[in-house]
Amino acid sequence: MSQNAGLLSYRSVFISDVHLGTKDARAEYLFDFLSHIRCEYLFLNGDIFDIWKMKTSRWQWPLLNTRLLQRVMELAAQGTQVVYVPGNHDEFFRDYLGSELGGVQIHREYRHTLADGRKALILHGDEFDGVVRHSRVLKWIGNAGYELLMGLNRISTRIRRLLGKGYWSLSLAIKNQVPNARTYIEKFETAAIRHAREQDVDVVVCGHIHHANLRQDGSVMYANSGDWVEHCTAIIEQENGALELVNWAKESADRLDVRALIQSLPVSAVARGKDRRPVGSGAAHS
């Protein structure tokens, strides 16, 4: 039996918006997902790290985050072409465009040919966000509201775990009821599709807005991989070039035991805030 026996096989996998470094990153689900797949291409489409949060005293780095990055390196070592397109929360890595770090290529955007011949443009998506590009005040207000939503989401997640229930995003359910949020998403998608037409590509793949979607608009397919904070979603390319949206929180609901996964790690260490000691090798952080 080969080491890849029993794994889900895809041609390409697109993930974005993991926000490692924050307490809301669902690293356990992404680690589980990457542990169950093999692929020719893995696209890390921005905001994999949250450098904004890591510059404050409120960042967190559980050992599971390190194991997750090791899994990415394992895939690269096994022959997967890993491409990292930094976003606005990890724009630090935009200083290294054209470089290769640990087998991971770093690009501002990337053009990928699907197996069926379609041309895909991969970019994070903050290029289309008027809030990020034009208004610091609106961005601050939005971030404050988002912090509140994610706080409620953490409480909901803890309660559901105590009740033995699977992951469900309270914050997402609330956002779906806000008309302005839906309008913003529609405008973002329209801007991305327009950009794809201007660039003469068949598919635009982005992230950024934490709203997974896959839809055809005339000659252009819009693909948003969502996030691993609220959705736990990815876009996958099958061997024939077909694109699909995967919700791993639902896919793994009957199987994934988060507590068992975390406890299986050799050290249950967590680095927080101003604690700069190295994580791992025996020292637990509180």
Can you describe what each PLM-predicted range is?
Residues 11-19, 54-58, 173-180:
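Short, basic, glycine/proline-bearing loop/turn elements
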